[in-house]
């Protein structure tokens, strides 16, 4: 990856439903110039999926944000802040939005490849970084499959015993 392509991006998990792009940016602006902040929403309902990304202009800003914000409270919820995976190639069966999966994809894939992933909706086995945020199939936000954040069907998932299922 060329130096110009380097992104200093944080994954932010455990967001309150009320947190939006602006409040996310404001919470992280103290650590340096925020290039982008994005709360990921469900395409069908428009509701927050409980996680997002913040991109900084420098590596030091990103590292400071991770160190100082991980485990802290934002809008009444304790958040998780980690360095985000690279977007990868964006094509084929994985990658960010590529092929049969990708970020928010429906058929495996996942953020940065693997099976399942962030927003993967079917037959997910991977998730964030390949092993699932919390392990198992489905990953963070997965709808079909076990594991994921909260176990069962993922954070707010439709199947399994998620513990974080806001649909009741």
Swiss-Prot record:
The keyword Protease does not apply. Keywords: RNA-binding. PROSITE patterns: RRM (PS50102). Residues 8-86 form the RRM domain. One of its GO terms (molecular function) is RNA binding. It comes from the Eukaryota. It holds the Pfam family RRM_1. InterPro entries: Nucleotide-bd_a/b_plait_sf, RBD_domain_sf, RRM2_NsCP33-like, RRM_dom, SLIRP/GR-RBP-like. CDD domains: RRM2_NsCP33_like (cd21608). Residues 148-168 are annotated as: Disordered. PANTHER family: HETEROGENEOUS NUCLEAR RIBONUCLEOPROTEIN 87F-RELATED. Possibly has a role in RNA transcription or processing during stress. This is Glycine-rich RNA-binding protein 2. The gene is GRP2.
């Amino acid at each position: 990856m060329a130096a110009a392509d380097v992104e200093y991006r944080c994954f932010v998990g455990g967001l309150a439903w009320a947190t939006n792009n602006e409040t996310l940016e404001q919470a992280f602006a103290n650590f340096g110039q925020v290039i982008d902040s994005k709360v990921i929403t469900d395409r069908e309902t428009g509701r927050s999926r409980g996680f997002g990304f913040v991109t900084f202009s420098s590596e030091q800003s990103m590292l400071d944000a991770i160190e100082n914000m991980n485990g802290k409270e934002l809008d009444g919820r304790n958040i998780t802040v980690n360095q985000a995976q690279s977007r990868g190639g964006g094509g084929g069966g994985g990658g960010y939005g590529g092929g049969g999966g990708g970020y928010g994809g429906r058929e495996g894939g996942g953020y940065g490849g693997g099976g399942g992933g962030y927003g993967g909706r079917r037959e997910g086995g991977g998730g964030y970084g390949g092993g699932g945020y919390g392990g198992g199939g489905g990953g963070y936000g997965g709808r079909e499959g076990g594991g994921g954040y909260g176990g069962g069907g993922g954070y707010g998932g439709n199947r399994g015993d998620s513990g974080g299922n806001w649909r009741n």
